[in-house]
């Protein structure tokens, strides 16, 4: 799929001392946390909220080794979504599709950085079910989803983002069924995408602070 350049690898460094390198006490060590998708050329990235939960530092990297620190613009805990901002322009943004047109048994493509590996993983599958959780609508997909795919997009046949990977199903017995993962419709991200990062100085200060450190990748 030629649009994998739209993806980013989301890494975090938490406040916990266990994430700090033994030989670099003043440098946060980035832990692979999940995936994301570029939704605006000015540096806006959409991911899952649980990917960046409790993070002290957030930074992203593409498969082409472009790396940048990010700030959290806004979150939607109800739908497990988060919008990040990096200080750059001219990025290639993902085309956004119409989630309302997604139907049962529709072919989809998922993409992300499985297991925190730097190579993009692309899998094909179908919409196994369109379910509701309370008043929410979620897509059940049968594509292979692994740790690290959370926050990554699902594409329709036209290469448009129609959903964001959020979770795998876990049965109360502890059994994790194969081929049973969920994605939130991209339409739930509309309120987040409508917001802008107005505090430019905050991003500039944050970026400068990280650049003064020797930020390591785990």
Task: Write out the residue ranges for each language-model feature.
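Extracytoplasmic/secreted proteins, especially bacterial periplasmic and envelope-associated proteins
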Residues: 104, 122, 140, 160, ...
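Catalytic nucleophile loop of clan PA
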Residues: 37-38, 144-165
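Conserved active-site neighborhood of the chymotrypsin/trypsin-like protease fold
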Residues: 33, 40-120, 135-139, 147, ...
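Short, compositionally biased
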Residues: 121-132
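C-terminal cap/linker of serine protease catalytic domains
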Residues: 21-29, 55, 70, 93, ...
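Small-residue-enriched segments and motifs
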Residues: 36, 58, 68-71, 125, ...
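Positively charged n-region of N-terminal signal peptides that target proteins for export
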Residues: 1-4
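Bacterial N-terminal signal peptides
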Residues: 7-18
């Amino acid at each position: 799929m030629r649009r994998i350049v739209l993806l980013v690898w989301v890494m975090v460094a938490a406040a916990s001392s266990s994430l700090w390198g033994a030989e670099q006490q003043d440098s946060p060590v980035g832990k692979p946390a999940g995936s994301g998708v570029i939704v605006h050329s000015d540096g806006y990235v959409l991911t899952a909220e649980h990917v960046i939960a409790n993070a002290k530092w957030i930074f992203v990297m593409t498969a082409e080794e472009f790396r940048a620190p990010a700030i959290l613009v806004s979150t939607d805990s109800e739908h497990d979504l988060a919008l990040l901002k990096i200080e750059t322009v001219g990025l290639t943004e993902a085309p956004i599709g119409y989630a309302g047109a997604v139907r049962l048994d529709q072919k989809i493509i998922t993409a992300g950085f499985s297991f925190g590996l730097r190579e993009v993983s692309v899998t094909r599958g179908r919409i196994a079910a369109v379910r509701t959780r309370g008043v929410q609508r979620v897509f059940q997909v049968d594509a292979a989803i692994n740790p690290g795919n959370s926050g990554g997009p699902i594409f329709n046949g036209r290469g448009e983002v129609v959903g964001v990977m959020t979770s795998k199903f876990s049965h109360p017995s502890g059994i994790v069924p194969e081929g049973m993962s969920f994605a939130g419709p991209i339409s739930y991200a509309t309120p987040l995408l409508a917001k802008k990062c107005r505090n430019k100085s905050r991003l500039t200060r944050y970026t400068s602070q990280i650049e003064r450190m020797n930020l390591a990748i785990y």
